[in-house]
Regions:
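Alpha-helical transmembrane segments and their membrane-interface boundaries
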Residues: 1-167
Length: 167
């Protein structure tokens, strides 16, 4: 009995690990350079985007940026008018699902919107909700754009064991 299955193209490689580490580090440095208060969100977004298959990286990146904007906006509005009310939080997640359906965002976009919403609403902050939302959107967008730049410039090499199978 197998505990898991895998596809050859989804296996990590040494070059992928280097690219991901490089991209995440660059995104944190850029975030700090431009004064983003929690630049680690840029690194998290970079790591997530770096795991996407090459053919879907750009469309998913655009979707993630749109979804982050939605989650940040609805999160800021919820925080201003209702605080961290769990019932309203659940309604906001439902609303994001409906908006995602209308905009034809895939589940990955919907999950990004919900994660951003949760970060804005559930983490107590000193700054106003709109400032927190703007920071999260900027940090996540920076991470996504950094990943896209690294993927475009640093192509991943072929794996050493091309004929490996999951049998």
């Amino acid at each position: 009995m197998k505990l898991w299955t895998w596809k050859r193209e989804n296996l990590p490689s040494l070059s992928h690990a280097f690219r991901t580490a490089f991209a995440a580090t660059i995104s944190i440095l850029l975030g700090r350079l431009i004064g983003l208060p929690e630049a680690y969100w840029a690194a998290i977004a970079t790591v997530v985007v770096m795991q996407s298959p090459l053919g879907t990286t750009v469309p998913l990146a655009i979707e993630r940026i749109v979804a982050s904007a939605l989650g940040a906006s609805i999160g800021a509005m919820e925080s201003i008018y209702f605080g961290a009310n769990l019932f309203v939080f659940a309604l906001a997640m439902l609303l994001l699902g409906l908006i995602s359906f209308v905009l034809r965002l895939e589940k990955v976009g919907y999950s990004y919107a919900c994660i951003t919403l949760a970060i804005i609403v559930m983490i107590p902050r000193a700054e106003t909700p709109w400032i927190a939302a703007a920071h999260r959107f900027a940090e996540v967008s920076l991470g996504i754009l950094t990943a896209l730049a690294v993927v475009a410039v640093w192509r991943e090499e072929q794996r050493l064991f091309e004929n490996t199978t999951a049998n």
